[in-house]
Each structure stands twice: as structure tokens, then as C-alpha cells.
From Swiss-Prot:
GO terms for molecular function: growth factor activity. The lineage of its organism: Eukaryota, Viridiplantae, Streptophyta, Embryophyta, Tracheophyta. Promotes plant cell differentiation, organogenesis and somatic embryogenesis as well as cell proliferation. Expressed in stems, roots and leaves. The gene is PSK2. Sulfation is important for activity and for the binding to a putative membrane receptor. Its main location: secreted. It holds the Pfam family PSK. Residues 1-22 form the signal peptide. This is Phytosulfokines 2. The modification Sulfotyrosine is found at Y78, Y80. It is found in: Secreted. GO terms for cellular component: extracellular matrix; extracellular region. Belongs to the phytosulfokine family.
């Protein structure tokens, strides 16, 4: 009985180490030493969003995917900007 429990323990340890090494590394690694400024991050994100909106897609009448994307962007923009105070 002791051999079975020892074998199961070794198998469990082996499986756990294999699971840790099989996990893919994160695509984006953020340094902990870099302090993130929330105001600066918001400006960067808004700048990237503005750059994305600069590219205007011309959708044809038959391009249903394009129309769906534009509708989704419009709804998302409305949802996230309706509470902002406009100057």
C-alpha cells in the first residue's frame, strides 16, 4: 500500500511540473517596476482609439460584415460616451 501511495505522489508531482511548463507565456509582460500613471494611460488609450476612428471604412450595400462592424462600433461608442460631459 505504501508503494501505491508513493507512486501516486510521484505521478502527481510529475504531472504538476509538466502542467506548469506546458502553460504558454503571456503575450504581453508588464514590468512591475514601471509605475503606471492612470491619467497618462487614459490619454494613450484615447489617442489609439482616435487613430482607429480616423480610418473610415466605406461599406458597400452587399458588405454585411462591414456594416455589422460599423454598427457595433457606433453602439459601443454611444454606450461609453453618453455619461461624459461634452465641453
Amino acid at each position: 500500500m505504501a508503494n501505491v501511495s508513493a507512486l501516486l505522489t510521484i505521478a502527481l508531482l510529475l504531472c504538476s511540473t509538466l502542467m506548469c511548463t506546458a502553460r504558454p507565456e503571456p503575450a504581453i509582460s508588464i514590468s512591475i517596476t514601471t509605475a503606471a500613471d492612470p491619467c497618462n494611460m487614459e490619454k494613450k488609450i484615447e489617442g489609439k482609439l482616435d487613430d482607429m476612428h480616423m480610418v473610415d471604412e466605406n461599406c458597400g450595400a452587399d458588405d454585411e460584415d462591414c456594416l455589422m462592424r460599423r454598427t457595433l462600433v457606433a453602439h459601443t461608442d454611444y454606450i461609453y460616451t453618453q455619461k461624459k460631459k461634452h465641453p
